[in-house]
């Protein structure tokens, strides 16, 4: 064992010594972050997760220690003993320890390091693949260490908050029964049950509901979940969520608990007071104004739905608008304030941008002093009455730019939603991380329970089939499922959905009606969810809950650009681990024991 480990104990971290410690003898452990040899003295910056401390090895004080220090190189892992002294006029204001240095009297090299494949510095230009390949080195960099320490703090605060609130931290199984539909599952073959598979849980949904039926009326868990889906910057195949369920609650009770957690996290982590209650917006309003159910409210520029207006004016001389409203399409406009000075080139770039999302083009009009439209093909045919009505609906002013989309609602919503954010970034309307107005929380409520699947010709649950419909909409379950809204809610922050949940169905008869509306027979429902249906008949309480995405929450709290920056050991966008080589091949004997055979043929 190293001498420093058995004979000495670390007294301080490398980030905590100040001028108040001058004169103390200290023992520090860490890595050589920087090294400078001035002949009679060797200087190093010693680093651990708390920060940096300058250490000086002087030849005329301890020649043997100075000689050993001459062997030090970057990333050597060492222990140092010495006295804290003032740096006098050589203060480094960038460091918390910048007023002092440690004059070493002893040194032990715990381990040497080969030259690192990249610099261990805050800002590096090394490609992400190389950093992920050597993730254990990447994690030595201060920005990532700060992020993971923030994540640990969020874990700690979350556990304390729920425990203090009377919640029980309970576990749920990772290996569960596979049920078709929903997210694609990772499958685990069962050696003891040949030909059968477990699925890795994509969420604890059913088990946390069963906890409520078992009488554990306040549950939480910080839980790992798994989804085999295509990856993006804000997705990982394994992810962590803060999972919560409560009995004897309605929607507002869930909001109150979760707002309390969020306010605590922002206060304790960032020192920022978030006002309560959070804004609430019906799903229908969110789609109409912003084109999606997770709007970024840090800036304005809402959409205006003009469908009824255009219909009232019988198309108003614009054939494409008329065609859209005659069918099932919609017409939307967005006012871009004081932007009539956009050049033709800039407008053309916007048009190329929307075409990349499936739009046929980008109709536009610049508003003149008298409300007339200029530099717009629409101006040639639109009736004055419709033009004036659109100006009034959009609250258009001279110098504004109006942008239009018309056609299939799903395309129009998506195009206009993305265009709004694209323009806001370009125009500098989005507050920077950490600035005033940087946090806009929103509950999006009352969405449809079902969405129509044109391919199968069936109604499907928009989220999951265990959400309680509005009582006033139960009459439509059989006759018109598209009219059924539900007690589902999403917590949105700055254009990201950071959590979602619902009040659950606890009435077995209504649950059966929901399954039938989805074309699920009694036999199929019993095959997939028989255990839940039985539990619902055993005095199931009213209950509801939510799950917050821990990874995304920390990403937003820290201002990270990607989930891979807040997960210690992330996968790439292809789902691979470049450090360990996962996923990898499996021994043929093990596959035989699992009764599994690969049919994959490399191209």
Swiss-Prot record:
Gene: aspS
Molecular function GO terms recorded: aspartate-tRNA ligase activity; aspartate-tRNA(Asn) ligase activity; ATP binding; nucleic acid binding
GO cellular component, one term: cytoplasm
Location, primary (coarse class): cytoplasm
Function in brief: Aspartyl-tRNA synthetase with relaxed tRNA specificity since it is able to aspartylate not only its cognate tRNA(Asp) but also tRNA(Asn). Reaction proceeds in two steps: L-aspartate is first activated by ATP to form Asp-AMP and then transferred to the acceptor end of tRNA(Asp/Asn).
Residues annotated as binding ATP: 227-229, 236, 497, 549-552
Residues given in the record as L-aspartate binding sites: 227, 463, 504
InterPro entries (alphabetical): Aa-tRNA-synt_II, aa-tRNA-synth_II, aa-tRNA-synth_II/BPL/LPL, Asp-tRNA-ligase_1, Asp-tRNA-ligase_1_N, Asp/Asn-tRNA-synth_IIb, AspRS_core, GAD-like_sf
Location of the region described as Aspartate in the Swiss-Prot/TrEMBL record: 205-208
Record keyword Aminoacyl-tRNA synthetase present: yes
Organism field: Anaeromyxobacter sp. (strain K)
Any one GO biological process: aspartyl-tRNA aminoacylation
The keyword Acyltransferase is assigned to this record: no
Similarity section: Belongs to the class-II aminoacyl-tRNA synthetase family. Type 1 subfamily.
Cystine residue pairs: none
Catalytic activity: tRNA(Asx) + L-aspartate + ATP = L-aspartyl-tRNA(Asx) + AMP + diphosphate
Localization annotation: Cytoplasm
Name of the featured protein: Aspartate--tRNA(Asp/Asn) ligase
Subunit structure: Homodimer.
